[in-house]
C-alpha cells in the first residue's frame, strides 16, 4: 500500500540534520544511520550513507535513480546460505 500523497515522503529528522551539516561544512564522510524507513531525497545524492542491516552498517552511495525509494531497499537484512544438500545414498 502506498503512502498518502497528503502526508508526503518521510525521512528521519536526525538524518536530515546530518546531511545538512555535511552540506554546510563541504565535507563528505560516511553518515551512519539506523533509519531504513527514510525516503531518499534529492539532497542525498552524492553522499554515502551507512545503513544498518541488523548486524553491521553497509555503505550505500546514493545516486540519482534511487530518489523516492527507501534506504532499507538497498541493504538486505537476510543472507541466503543455500538449501540443505540431501545426500541420498543407496546401499547399507
UniProtKB/Swiss-Prot annotation:
This is Small ribosomal subunit protein uS19. Belongs to the universal ribosomal protein uS19 family. GO terms for cellular component: cytoplasm; small ribosomal subunit. GO terms for molecular function: rRNA binding; structural constituent of ribosome. Protein S19 forms a complex with S13 that binds strongly to the 16S ribosomal RNA. It comes from Leuconostoc mesenteroides subsp. mesenteroides (strain ATCC 8293 / DSM 20343 / BCRC 11652 / CCM 1803 / JCM 6124 / NCDO 523 / NBRC 100496 / NCIMB 8023 / NCTC 12954 / NRRL B-1118 / 37Y). Keywords: Ribonucleoprotein, Ribosomal protein, RNA-binding, rRNA-binding. One of its GO terms (biological process) is translation. The keyword Ribonucleoprotein applies. The keyword Ribonucleoprotein applies. Pfam families: Ribosomal_S19.
